[in-house]
């Protein structure tokens, strides 16, 4: 799974890097501009809300299609209600990142796996084909 991390704190980037295993392809970005300049499409964007002078929520409203799913990672729990949209799958408070990040990434990975599965209904069984 290709994961982008849009987080302006290098300390938080390192926390995320240490929590996720090496089976994921991680790309880290400090600014919205860096993220937009990348030529990749991401399965998941781990997104901070406060990015210096920029706002992650406003960014997603303007650019919803560069990633399949979004999980916000922020210390601004009061903004949680403003984050949810069709492709937002969660909100992790930074103080609880060690408890929640791996589980949430696994949930996203399972969701992607389900979306990529095609059922073939054969006469005596159902077979699944994965894209």
Language-model-detected regions and their locations in the chain:
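Acidic, metal-coordinating helix/loop segments flanking the phosphotransfer/catalytic sites
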Residues: 28-44
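Active-site residues of response regulator receiver
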Residues: 48
